A protein has these predicted regions:
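ATP-dependent carboxylate/phosphate-activation module, predominantly the ATP-grasp catalytic core
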Residues: 51, 56-163
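Active-site nucleotide/adenylate-binding loops and adjacent lid/helix of ATP-dependent enzymes
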Residues: 1-91
Length: 163
């Protein structure tokens, strides 16, 4: 990898290790026993399978109790799993349509806003909302339109000026 690529990885990819009984370093670079670290830091970690998609097999530490987390570690040790530090994501209130009540209801959702960057320029967005920590569609998330309020105001001002 080039220096620029390495910088991008270290800047944007959270601390990641293969789940195994080994010595390594923690996110600050201190030596650790990895399994002990994983057990002690459940609320700040997520474990992900190497060969799955759509949120299948992901263990979100802050959503599990200690017993469930220990079971997750055993599962991770028997397969190919990675452990990563938690990345804080936005949660906010959004309206949704409740077809049972035929009414709009407000709820708190996890926001997943993923820019498509080409040659240093943002060329588009993928935006999803989810009632859970996982935003992918198979885990209950849903794609939603992204609207730039700044751009919308500018276009509205242009339209008003044209009238």
């Amino acid at each position: 990898m080039t220096e620029e690529q390495l910088f991008a990885v270290y800047t944007h990819v959270p601390w990641t290790r293969k789940v195994e009984d080994t010595k390594t370093t923690d996110p600050e670079g201190h030596p650790i026993e990895l399994l002990y670290f994983i057990r002690q830091n459940r609320r700040d970690l997520v474990m992900k399978p190497n060969d799955e998609y759509g949120g299948k097999g992901i263990f979100v530490g802050w959503e599990l109790d200690d017993r469930e987390w220990d079971n997750a570690i055993q599962t991770a040790l028997s397969a190919h799993y990675l452990v990563q530090t938690r990345v804080e994501v936005a949660r906010d209130s959004y309206p949704s349509w409740n077809s049972d009540d035929e009414a709009i209801q407000w709820g708190e959702y996890t926001v997943d806003l993923d820019p498509f960057v080409f040659f240093g320029e943002i060329e588009g967005l993928l935006t999803r909302l989810s009632a859970t920590a996982l935003c992918n569609v198979t885990a209950g998330g849903g794609g939603v339109p992204a609207v730039s309020a700044k751009l919308a105001r500018a276009e509205a001002a242009e339209a008003e000026a044209a009238e």
